[in-house]
Amino acid sequence: MNDSPIISVVLPFLIKDNDDKSLNYQGINNLIISIDSIIEQTFKEWELILVDDGSNNEILEQLLSKRYSTDNRIKFIINKENKGIVKSLNDAILNHCSPTSKYIARMDSDDISHPTRLQSQLKYLQSNETIDILGCPIKMFNNNKLIEILNNNNNNNNINNNVKELINIINNEESFKFIQHPDKDILMWSMFFNCCIVHPSVIFKRSIFTIEHCYEENNQFPFIEDYLFWLKSLIMKGLNISNIQSSTPLLYLRKHNNSISFKNIEKQKDSTANASCYYLNILFKRFNIDSEIIQNSSLSMKEIIQFFQLSPSSLSKINNISIELFEFAFKYLELIEKSCTKQQPNYSNSIKDAANEKMGELVSLCLSNYPNNQKSSLLWEKWLSRNPTSQLLSLLSNLNVKSSTTIINNNINNNNNNNNNNNNNNNNNNNNNNNNNNNNNSILNFISGINSNKINTPKSNNNKFKENGIRIICFSKDRAFQLKEYLRTFFKYLKNDDNGNDKFEIIVDVLFTYSNEKFKNSYQLVIESFPQVNFIKEENFTDQLINLVQKTNKLEYVMFSVDDILYYNEFNLKEYCLSLNSEPLALGFYMKLNKNITYCHTCNQDITIPLNSNTISRTENNFKYLKWNRNDNDCKKDWNYPWDLCSTIYRCNDIDSIINGIVKYYGIRNGINHPNRFEFNGNRPIIQKQIYQNKPYCLCLSDHYSPMSVVTINRVQDVYDNPIYDQTLSLDDLDQLLYSNKSLNDEKYKENSLSLNFKSVHIGELFIS
């Protein structure tokens, strides 16, 4: 029994009988799965408040009572009459939460929470104390498709009540959509176009929810009680809202035709546009922003907002968009940007980047529709004057327009010359690429996937001007101890066999960030211990990453790393790069893999070494490596994860092309603004065979052991709560190890590796010395 819960999970439900008066077994089963997903949380200090909002079903009540009555963490509230979602939520939160509860988490009756959802969200809130409301990544799954998969497995009854098995199936189904909404930097900006925080994924501070600030029933804005609460929290209360940025979904959202949101989708869209206009007008008045240009137009604010609510693919299919709509939409974006910047000045740079991206999409479509119109060219000039990033310029240079192409390319080249006077070679390459890409699709086509069969592998800059060597880029957040161990063992086991005649340069960079002053001080200790390393405080991940990889990198190869990697066997980066150089059809050299990797911890299942793998011996010094084709059917999980940040070596020109591919498909803001997203979005277009099918091969060591492992003693984004995590440490625990002068016992890890005890890339054993 938990008498002092920290989190109150509120789950309202209404389950009616089927149309033929039979019991709604599907609805009941979905509810049970939803409840069980909370019971199976790794974080245990919770209470679950179940609100039956007028089901009036004795069989249902008896079933739930029999199944859950012995769990004192679960409370039942039964409304004999249907009160509606707003009154049910307000009553549960204001009147039925335990006094000790500090946070409120939402849950819906047909969704599934990942086992680490509450733990991950609480950890984030405790590390980011200024955040008041927090969402998380979700994966949206179609209920009919899931039932079809279960039926095909011939074990429907066994799986349908098993939370982890269901999550496993949903994660492995590529047709189910992963959704990652923006973080605090641009959440307000994004909120005016569409609701970008998923209600059942939310956890918020209990202290912000009062009689004066709660969910509202508003006839002016029906069916969007959550969206209204977010807007009111942001604009009227000045609260901070964010979403966890991770490639791991923490909530699985079920979509089916019987859901309230599905039945009222058009009304919700209309209410969303009305509410957006209402709160934007509040901001315009608050900051004396002159919106007369919009008010005097033939288009209403609502019409322009509804224009922005359409997806890029939908917009690209509309042939009769007037040039005036493009003009007013651009001006409206300027007003929204100005109001958001006034409301949240700390995020002004991120808001500007997001505005540039949306304006870029608008200008792209305008030029495609009106290639010979002077107003289109003026819009382009206006957007260009905002100094958008070179990546956005590069995308828009690929517009499929006629007479505007020369204007665009000239302006891009002029802008590049003005901003990058020292990069003449790069500008010349860009000019050539721009001239060769006039027939490519626009940014909107890349984003929406239209005509994907016409999308070619992105062109990359030639590596012939790069110098012989490798740049190591390690990412770290709040884990100074693990970063110290990464660097200590990296230099301990790095073999340097330069003979002076064939210099191989190695540069090590660390891009790090921290959430509080304590961790900042810890990083300072690490910085002082490794003067040979370039430490860079993360301020803008996207810009800094591109600067390291593309703008300032002079070396031929790049290896990405994360701070929880530990090296324990000797390794030779030069040999690995030479092996990659000898295999032009290979994408990367994967230091984490070896012939003993036969288990994938993230999906909790055994995997096999690719049957087509061959041991290759280089003639120079008989160095041996393993080579396999990742496109073969038996290449699963770790053996088909081409874009990887765990000590994988890539050619610099391939990295350029993959980054360009990420931006084309997912946008610069959403594509590469975080290490997890950078890795996840890099894999999606490769695995889905949209890019890089001309390099299907992968390389690794031919031995049965690797020089390193990912030591997950403090996990960040893992999918499954496997037994290897029994000794998981908190960030504070790790920091204490740093100040106690402790180290990971790399000799012990080496001993286990040579004994072939490590069958997974990720290991959870904790050996301290």
Swiss-Prot record:
Site feature (Important for Fuc-transferase activity) residues: D654
Highest taxon listed in the record's lineage: Eukaryota
InterPro entries: Glyco_trans_2-like (IPR001173), Glycosyltransf_2 (IPR050834), Nucleotide-diphossugar_trans (IPR029044)
Effect of D509N: 39-60% decrease in both Gal- and Fuc-transferase activities
UniProt keyword annotation of Glycosyltransferase present: yes
Residue ranges of the region described as Disordered: 410-442
GO biological process: SCF complex assembly
Region of interest called N-acetylgalactosamine 3-beta-galactosyltransferase, as start-end residue ranges on this chain: 25-210
Residue segments, region Alpha-1,2-fucosyltransferase: 442-769
Enzyme class: transferase
Keyword Transit peptide among UniProt keywords: no
Gene Ontology CC terms, in alphabetical order: cytoplasm
Site (Important for Gal-transferase activity): D53, D226
Annotated site, Important for Gal- and Fuc-transferase activities, chain positions: D509
Pfam entry (one): Glycos_transf_2
Molecular function GO labels: alpha-(1,2)-fucosyltransferase activity; fucosyltransferase activity; galactoside 2-alpha-L-fucosyltransferase activity; glycoprotein-N-acetylgalactosamine 3-beta-galactosyltransferase activity; N-acetyl-beta-D-glucosaminide beta-(1,3)-galactosyltransferase activity
Low complexity bias (residue ranges): 410-441
EC number: 2.4.1.-, 2.4.1.69
Keyword terms: Glycosyltransferase, Transferase
Catalytic activity: an N-acetyl-beta-D-glucosaminyl derivative + UDP-alpha-D-galactose = a beta-D-galactosyl-(1->3)-N-acetyl-beta-D-glucosaminyl derivative + UDP + H(+); a beta-D-galactosyl-(1->3)-N-acetyl-beta-D-glucosaminyl derivative + GDP-beta-L-fucose = an alpha-L-Fuc-(1->2)-beta-D-Gal-(1->3)-beta-D-GlcNAc derivative + GDP + H(+)
UniProt similarity note: Belongs to the glycosyltransferase 2 family.
Function field: Bifunctional protein composed of 2 glycosyltransferase domains involved in glycosylating skp1. The N-terminal part catalyzes the transfer of a galactose residue to GlcNAc-skp1 in a beta 1-3 linkage. The C-terminal part catalyzes the transfer of a fucose residue to Gal-GlcNAc-skp1 in an alpha 1-2 linkage.
Name the UniProt record assigns to this protein: Bifunctional glycosyltransferase pgtA
Protein source organism: Dictyostelium discoideum (Social amoeba)
